[in-house]
């Protein structure tokens, strides 16, 4: 999942035509500044959230402080392994050099991984333990969503903070939101 060494895909990425002519058994996408787009004049790179097993949604909520189901609908791929999927998001250019790959765990729960930079994600083809990768939300039907600000802020916080055993997430709320929450 992480390429290193001379001659890897980052030094000489393939065109779509070259990929189709390779005759391989899978296709992956490069993350970070290797896969970019421009939306309304602003540049973005590709990032992903990899939910890795039973309870990974609980790990996400525990660490990030927000239910994973509140993420915007986006292109998503799965390997066929139980409770695993990878969700793709556009990351604003100003975050591309700040955010790093993070593998986050909670005891007795599946982990989740925030993926970017010198990583790639398999999106099609064979998988060693299943019938292969498949789209949960296909790019033919869904756009890749822009990562929500709360996710970017959390990710930036854990990338720039000195290592700590416990990371607490405070969700920034407006005065109106706090009043509404307290009136329930």
Residue ranges and their predicted role:
Residues 1-180:
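Conserved phosphate/metal-binding and DNA-contacting active-site motifs used
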């Amino acid at each position: 999942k992480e390429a290193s060494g001379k001659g890897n895909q980052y030094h000489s990425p393939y065109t779509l035509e070259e990929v189709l002519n390779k005759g391989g058994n899978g296709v992956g996408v490069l993350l970070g500044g290797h896969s970019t787009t421009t939306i309304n004049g602003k540049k973005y790179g590709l990032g992903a959230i990899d939910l890795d097993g039973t309870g990974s949604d609980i790990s996400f909520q525990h660490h990030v402080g927000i239910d994973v189901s509140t993420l915007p609908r986006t292109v998503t791929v799965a390997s066929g392994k139980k409770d695993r999927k990878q969700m793709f998001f556009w990351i604003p250019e100003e975050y591309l050099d700040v955010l790093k790959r993070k593998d986050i765990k909670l005891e007795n729960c599946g982990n989740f991984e925030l993926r970017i930079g010198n990583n790639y994600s398999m999106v099609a083809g064979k998988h060693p333990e299943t019938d292969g990768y498949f789209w949960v939300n296909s790019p033919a039907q869904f756009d890749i969503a822009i990562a929500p600000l709360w996710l970017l802020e959390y990710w930036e916080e854990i990338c720039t903070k000195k290592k700590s055993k416990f990371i607490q997430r405070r969700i920034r709320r407006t005065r109106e939101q706090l009043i509404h929450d307290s009136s329930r």
